[in-house]
From Swiss-Prot:
Residues 67-108, 382-614, 642-753, 922-975 are annotated as: Disordered. Residues 402-432, 440-464, 588-597 have a biased composition (Basic and acidic residues). The modification Phosphoserine is found at S948, S949. Residues 129-156, 194-216 form a coiled coil. The gene is CAPRIN2. It comes from the Eukaryota. Ca(2+) 2 binds at E1084. This is Caprin-2. The lineage of its organism: Eukaryota, Metazoa, Chordata, Craniata, Vertebrata. Changing E1084A: Loss of calcium binding and increased homotrimer stability.
Length: 1127
C-alpha cells in the first residue's frame, strides 16, 4: 500500500548536470586566470555527489575585483559588482551590502533549488564575459587610434608606444573571448535543458504517486462500503462465492472502521469538518502507522484491506437470489404504472376534444358569464350588490364557455388569454351612467383599444353570421359602453396600435349598423355628439361626458379616485375618446401652426387641408366660422417620435375639421383636464393671449403606457356657456405618479405645460443625462410660495406692435440654426424628452420674423442670447439638496428680442453667451441691480407653477424666492418664462452629479535603499492631496470613486551599480514598470505612466522591485495621479 518514489532517473539526470558544470568550471577557471591575471581566482568546489537533492554549489572566496591598469581594467570592478547585482533580482536576502558576502555566496546560500543556483551562476559568468569582451573592444579601438596617430607623424609617450606593440595580442584575446562566449552559451543552454527535463520528470513522478494514493483511497472506500451489506459479511465469514475467509473478529474491525471512514451524515457538523475527520482516518491507513483504532492498528487494517483487494471478490460481488426476485416485481410495477398513466392521458384528451366540439358557441356571450368570476379588484366593491342578473343570464346560456377553445387562428393561445381579460370587464355595463367610473379602468380601456382592432374585426365577422349580436343587445341594453371597454381590455400590447391604423377602417364601417339603435337613446347626453364616428367613439360618448362633469361637480370623489392613479390615466382617458385615425389629425388643430416643414402622413389618416401654410390657415379660418363660437386651434407644436418602436413618422400630422364632434369634445375635455399633470414652467406664448394651455402628455414607449402629446388651447370667451364652468371653474389637481400627492395648480389663465415624467424614457434624446436622485417624502413637499394666478402683461421698450394671436406661418422658416444644434433642436415647438431629460422649445411668436439665436449644444448648458444679451446663472441648492441654477428674472426685452443688459455694480461680464462644459457649473455672485428695470421684471416670472423633475417621478420641487429682489431661485427643472418678444430658448437644467476633485503628488527627499526585494515606496513629502485620497504613511492611493485615473511616476536611480526596477501596482498586480541602468555608477531616471480604469476601493502604489532611489530637497523622485473622468 505504501507508495515508493523511485529516484534513479532523477539522480541520473542530476549527475549529468554536475558533469556539465564541472566541464564549465574548468573552462571558466582557465578563462578567469587569463582575463584577470592580477586578481584572485574563482575557486569552484564540487564535492562528490552524495545525493541528488543536496548539491553544494559554487563558492567565491575573494573581495570584488580591483585592477591596476587604467587602460584595460577600468570596468572590471563593474563586472564584479554586476555579478552581485543579478542575484538580487531572484533570491538575495542580504540587501545591497557590496562588501559583506561575496555575490555568489549570498546567491547560492539563498537559492531555493539547485536549478536556480545553476542558472544564477551561469548567468553571472556570461555577464562577466560579455563585459570583458566589451573592454577588450574598447582597448582595441584605442590602440587603433594610437596607430593612426603614429602614421600621421604624431609623437606618443612610452606607455602608448608599449600599448601599440600589444595590438596583435589584444586582437587574439578578443577572438578567443568571443569563441569562449559561444562555448559557454552552448553549455549553459544544454545545462538548462537537462535541468528542466529532470524537473519535469520529478514532477511527473510526484504526480503519479499522488494519483496512486487517490486511487488506493477510492478502492478502500469501495471495499468498506460493501462490507456493510449482510450477504457480503456472510460470504467472508463462510468463505463463500470466492471470498477469503475472515474471522468474525477481524470482520468486526473492518465494519467498525467503515463506520468511521464512511459515516452517515452528521447534521451537527459541517460537511467540511466531517470529511476532514474521515480524511484523517484514510491518511493514517495509507501511512500504515501503529496507531490504535477500533481495537487494532492501522497497519493491521491495511494488511486486511490489501488481502481483500487481492482476493478478487470485489471485482464482481455476487447478488443473492432474494434480491433478484425483489427487483423483478418492482420493475413490473413501474411498467404497469406508466401504462396506466398513458391510458389515462389518452382518455382525458378524447373527452376534452369531445367537449370542445360540444360547446362551440358564439364568442361574445361568454363574457357576461365569466366576468362574474374574474372580477377586477378595482370594481369589486362597486359590484357586490349587483350579482343577481348574471345568474339569470347564465341560466339562458349554459353552453357558452367553450367557444374560446375552438378558435384555430395562429394566435389562438393569445386569444384565450385575451378572453379572460375581456370577461373581467363585461359587468361594467351596469355602471355606465355612474359618475364614479374608475379612472384606472378608463386608462386600461384606452391602452388596450388601439391594439384590439384586428381581433375585433375577426370577431365581428364571425358574430354577424350568427344570431348572437341581436340577442346580446337584448340581454344587455345598458352595456354598449361596457362592451367597448371589454373589447379594449382584451389587448395588453399597446405598441401595436400605430401600425394598425389602416385596419381600423373596416371595423368602423361594419360596427355602426349594430350599434346605431342603442346609440339613439344615448346621444342626448351631449349635443355636440351628433354623428357616430366609430365603435369606440359611440361607446364612450354616454360615459365620458357625465363622468367628467360629475368629477368637476364633486371633487371629493374625483380626488379619492385620482389618488390611486398615475397622471397618465388622465391623458389616456382623454385620448381614448377619439378614434385612432382621427386622434392624430386632431393634433394639427391643437398645436402651433408655424411649422411649414414637409412631413409624412400617417397611414389611414385623411387630411382636407392644403399643405401650403397660408392656404391651410385660410382653410382653417373658414372652417372655424362654421362652428358655434370660435376655437383657437392654431398652435402646432408636434412631438416628433423618432423611436423605432413607433410607427408614426409624423412631426406635423394632417388636421381634422375643428368643428367636428371630435374636436369639440376634445376641446371640452382637454380644457377641463388642464393641469392634470405636473406643470412645467414654459415660455408664455402670445398666441394664447390669456388662454388655457393643456398639454396632455402621453407616451408611446415600451413601458406600456401609450399616449401622445396634445395641446388644445381654448380661449375663455370661445367656450360655450354650458361647458365653461366645468372646464374653468375648478381644474382638477394633478396626481404625482407613484406618490399619490396632490398639487394645487394655477388657474386657467396661466400658460403652463404638463409633463408626464415616467414615459419619457424612449423619446428622442436631447441630452442623454440620467442622474438618478433619491425620492423625497411627502412631508418634505411644500406649497409654492407664489400666487397661483397672475395676469400676463407685456412690457416692451420698443415701438413694435404688441403680439398678435395669429401670426403668419413663415416665421420659423427663417429661423437659423447653429451647426451643432441641427440634430437635436426642432424649431416647431417640439418638447423633447428622453432618459430623464427635458428640453422645451416654445414657439417663436414675434411680430417681425427674425432668426433665432444659435445656442451651444453642450450637456447642461443654458442657452442664452447672442447679441448684447447675457445669461446669468447662479448656483443654488434646491430644497432637495441638489445643485441647480439660479436664473434671474427676465427684464423687459428690447426690440432685437434679447435680454436687456443687467447692470452690476461689482463687475461686468461680456455679452457673449456662456457655454458650459461637462460637469461644470458657472457660479456668479450677484451684485445689486439697478432699480429701474426691476420694477418691470415681474411679467416674465409671474408663473410659478410647480414642476416635476423627470429624474424624480414622485416628488415636487418648490420654486422659492431667493430674497434678492427680483432674483428667483430656479430648481433643477425650472424653465424661465420670459416676455413674448424675447426670443429665448429655455432648456432643462440637469442636477448633474458633482465630479469629485481627486489629485495628489508626493515626493521623496531622502534616499531609499531597502535591504530586501519588492518593497513599497513610501514618500515623505506631500505636495498635493486633493480629496485626501493618498496615504502618506503607506504610500498608497485609495480610489474614492469609480472612474478613469492618470498616474505618473519618476524615480531617480541612486549612483550604484545596481539597476533600478520600479513597478506601478494596483492592489497586488503589476500594471506597468520602469527600468534604469546603463551599467555605470551614475544617476538615471526610471519613469512611466498609466491611464487606468479603477473601481472604488482599489489601491495604487509603487513597488521598488530592486535597486535604490535617490532623494533630495529638490525632489527628483515623485509620484502623482489624478481623476480624469468619473463614472
Amino acid at each position: 500500500m505504501e507508495v515508493q518514489v523511485s529516484q534513479a532517473s532523477l539522480g541520473f539526470e542530476l549527475t549529468s548536470v554536475e558533469k556539465s558544470l564541472r566541464e564549465w568550471s574548468r573552462l571558466s577557471r582557465e578563462v578567469i586566470a587569463w582575463l584577470c591575471p592580477s586578481s584572485p581566482n574563482f575557486i569552484l568546489n564540487f564535492p562528490p555527489p552524495p545525493s541528488a537533492s543536496s548539491v553544494s554549489m559554487v563558492q567565491l572566496f575573494s573581495s570584488p575585483f580591483g585592477y591596476q591598469s587604467p587602460s584595460g581594467h577600468s570596468e572590471e570592478e563593474r563586472e564584479g559588482n554586476m555579478k552581485s547585482a543579478k542575484p538580487q533580482v531572484n533570491h538575495s536576502q542580504h540587501g545591497e551590502s557590496q562588501r559583506a558576502l561575496s555575490p555568489l555566496q549570498s546567491t547560492l546560500s539563498s537559492a531555493a533549488s539547485p536549478s536556480q543556483a545553476y542558472e544564477t551562476y551561469i548567468e553571472n559568468g556570461l555577464i562577466c564575459l560579455k563585459h570583458k569582451i566589451r573592454n577588450i573592444e574598447k582597448k582595441k579601438l584605442k590602440l587603433e587610434d594610437y596607430k593612426d596617430r603614429l602614421k600621421s607623424g604624431e609623437h606618443l609617450n612610452p606607455d602608448q608606444l608599449e600599448a601599440v606593440e600589444k595590438y596583435e595580442e589584444v586582437l587574439h584575446n578578443l577572438e578567443f573571448a568571443k569563441e569562449l562566449q559561444k562555448t559557454f552559451s552552448g553549455l549553459s543552454l544544454d545545462l538548462l535543458k537537462a535541468q528542466k527535463k529532470a524537473q519535469r520528470r520529478e514532477h511527473m513522478l510526484k504526480l503519479e504517486a499522488e494519483k496512486k494514493k487517490l486511487r488506493t483511497i477510492l478502492q478502500v472506500q469501495y471495499v468498506l462500503q460493501n462490507l456493510t451489506q449482510e450477504h457480503v459479511q456472510k460470504d467472508f465469514k463462510g468463505g463463500l462465492n470466492g471470498a477469503v475467509y475472515l474471522p468474525s473478529k477481524e470482520l468486526d474491525y473492518l465494519i467498525k472502521f467503515s463506520k468511521l471512514t464512511c459515516p452517515e451524515r452528521n447534521e451537527s457538523l459541517s460537511v467540511e469538518d466531517q470529511m476532514e475527520q474521515s480524511s484523517l482516518y484514510f491518511w493514517d491507513l495509507l501511512e500504515g502507522s501503529e496507531k490504535a483504532v477500533v481495537g487494532t492498528t492501522y497497519k493491521h487494517l491495511k494488511d486486511l484491506l490489501s488481502k481483500l483487494l487481492n482476493s478478487g471478490y470485489f471485482e464482481s460481488i455476487p447478488v443473492p437470489k432474494n434480491a433478484k426476485e425483489k427487483e423483478v416485481p418492482l420493475e413490473e410495477e413501474m411498467l404497469i404504472q406508466s401504462e396506466k398513466k398513458t391510458q389515462l392521458s389518452k382518455t382525458e384528451s378524447v373527452k376534452e376534444s369531445e367537449s370542445l366540439m360540444e360547446f362551440a358557441q358564439p364568442e361574445i356571450q361568454p363574457q357576461e358569464f365569466l366576468n362574474r368570476r374574474y372580477m377586477t379588484e378595482v370594481d369589486y366593491s362597486n359590484k357586490q350588490g349587483e350579482e343577481q342578473p348574471w345568474e339569470a343570464d347564465y341560466a339562458r346560456k349554459p353552453n357558452l364557455p367553450k367557444r374560446w377553445d375552438m378558435l384555430t387562428e395562429p394566435d389562438g393561445q393569445e386569444k384565450k388569454q385575451e378572453s379572460f381579460k375581456s370577461w373581467e370587464a363585461s359587468g361594467k355595463h351596469q355602471e355606465v351612467s355612474k359618475p364614479a367610473v374608475s379612472l384606472e379602468q378608463r386608462k386600461q380601456d384606452t391602452s388596450k383599444l388601439r391594439s384590439t382592432l384586428p381581433e375585433e374585426q375577426k370577431k365581428q365577422e364571425i358574430s354577424k353570421s350568427k344570431p348572437s349580436p341581436s340577442q346580446w343587445k337584448q340581454d344587455t341594453p345598458k352595456s354598449k359602453a361596457g362592451y367597448v371597454q371589454e373589447e379594449q381590455k382584451k389587448q395588453e400590447t399597446p405598441k401595436l396600435w400605430p401600425v394598425q391604423l389602416q385596419k381600423e377602417q373596416d371595423p368602423k364601417k361594419q360596427t355602426p349598423k349594430s350599434w346605431t339603435p342603442s346609440m339613439q337613446s344615448e346621444q342626448n347626453t351631449t349635443k355636440s355628439w351628433t354623428t357616430p364616428m366609430c365603435e369606440e367613439q359611440d361607446s364612450k360618448q354616454p360615459e365620458t361626458p357625465k363622468s367628467w362633469e360629475n368629477n368637476v361637480e364633486s371633487q371629493k370623489h374625483s380626488l379619492t379616485s385620482q389618488s390611486q392613479i398615475s397622471p397618465k390615466s388622465w391623458g389616456v382617458a382623454t385620448a381614448s375618446l377619439i378614434p385612432n385615425d382621427q386622434l392624430l389629425p386632431r393634433k394639427l388643430n391643437t398645436e402651433p401652426k408655424d411649422v411649414p416643414k414637409p412631413v409624412h402622413q400617417p397611414v389611414g389618416s385623411s387630411s382636407t387641408l392644403p399643405k401650403d401654410p397660408v392656404l391651410r390657415k385660410e382653410k382653417l379660418q373658414d372652417l372655424m366660422t362654421q362652428i358655434q363660437g370660435t376655437c383657437n386651434f392654431m398652435q402646432e407644436s408636434v412631438l416628433d417620435f423618432d423611436k423605432p418602436s413607433s410607427a408614426i413618422p409624423t412631426s406635423q400630422p394632417p388636421s381634422a375639421t375643428p368643428g367636428s364632434p371630435v374636436a369639440s369634445k376634445e376641446q371640452n375635455l382637454s380644457s377641463q383636464s388642464d393641469f392634470l399633470q405636473e406643470p412645467l414652467q414654459a415660455t408664455s406664448s402670445p398666441v394664447t393671449c390669456s388662454s388655457n394651455a393643456c398639454l396632455v402628455t402621453t407616451d408611446q414607449a415600451s413601458s406600456g403606457s401609450e399616449t401622445e402629446f396634445m395641446t388644445s388651447e381654448t380661449p375663455e370667451a370661445a367656450i360655450p356657456p354650458g361647458k365653461q364652468p366645468s372646464s374653468l371653474a375648478s381644474p382638477n389637481p394633478p396626481m404625482a405618479k407613484g406618490s399619490e400627492q396632490g398639487f394645487q395648480s394655477p388657474p386657467a389663465s396661466s400658460s403652463s405645460v404638463t409633463i408626464n415624467t415616467a414615459p419619457f424614457q424612449a423619446m428622442q434624446t436631447v441630452f442623454n443625462v440620467n442622474a438618478p436622485l433619491p425620492p423625497r417624502k411627502e412631508q418634505e413637499i411644500k406649497e409654492s410660495p407664489y400666487s397661483p394666478g397672475y395676469n400676463q402683461s407685456f412690457t416692451t421698450a420698443s415701438t413694435q406692435t404688441p403680439p398678435q394671436c395669429q401670426l403668419p406661418s413663415i416665421h420659423v422658416e427663417q429661423t437659423v440654426h447653429s451647426q451643432e444644434t441641427a440634430a437635436n433642436y426642432h424649431p416647431d415647438g417640439t418638447i423633447q424628452v428622453s432618459n430623464g431629460s427635458l428640453a422645451f422649445y416654445p414657439a417663436q411668436t414675434n411680430v417681425f420674423p427674425r432668426p433665432t439665436q444659435p445656442f451651444v449644444n453642450s450637456r447642461g448648458s443654458v442657452r442664452g442670447c447672442t447679441r448684447g444679451g447675457r445669461l446669468i446663472t447662479n448656483s443654488y441648492r434646491s430644497p432637495g439638496g441638489y445643485k441647480g441654477f439660479d436664473t434671474y428674472r427676465g427684464l423687459p426685452s428690447i426690440s432685437n428680442g434679447n435680454y436687456s443688459q443687467l447692470q452690476f455694480q461689482a463687475r461686468e461680464y461680456s455679452g457673449a453667451p456662456y457655454s458650459q462644459r461637462d460637469n461644470f457649473q458657472q457660479c456668479y455672485k450677484r451684485g445689486g441691480t439697478s432699480g429701474g428695470p426691476r420694477a418691470n421684471s415681474r411679467a416674465g416670472w409671474s408663473d410659478s407653477s410647480q414642476v416635476s423633475s423627470p429624474e424624480r417621478d414622485n416628488e415636487t420641487f418648490n420654486s422659492g424666492d431667493s430674497g434678492q429682489g427680483d432674483s428667483r431661485s430656479m430648481t433643477p427643472v425650472d424653465v424661465p418664462v420670459t416676455n413674448p418678444a424675447a426670443t429665448i430658448l429655455p432648456v432643462h437644467v440637469y442636477p448633474l452629479p458633482q465630479q469629485m476633485r481627486v489629485a495628489f503628488s508626493a515626493a521623496r527627499t531622502s534616499n531609499l535603499a531597502p535591504g530586501t526585494l519588492d518593497q513599497p515606496i513610501v514618500f515623505d513629502l506631500l505636495l498635493n492631496n486633493l480629496g485626501e485620497t493618498f496615504d502618506l504613511q503607506l504610500g498608497r492611493f485609495n480610489c474614492p470613486v469609480n472612474g478613469t485615473y492618470v498616474f505618473i511616476f519618476h524615480m531617480l536611480k541612486l549612483a550604484v551599480n545596481v539597476p533600478l526596477y520600479v513597478n506601478l501596482m494596483k492592489n497586488e498586480e503589476v500594471l506597468v514598470s520602469a527600468y534604469a541602468n546603463d551599467g555605470a555608477p551614475d544617476h538615471e531616471t526610471a519613469s512611466n505612466h498609466a491611464i487606468l480604469q479603477l473601481f472604488q476601493g482599489d489601491q495604487i502604489w509603487l513597488r521598488l522591485h530592486r535597486g535604490a532611489i535617490y532623494g533630495s530637497s529638490w525632489k527628483y523622485s515623485t509620484f502623482s495621479g489624478y481623476l480624469l473622468y468619473q463614472d
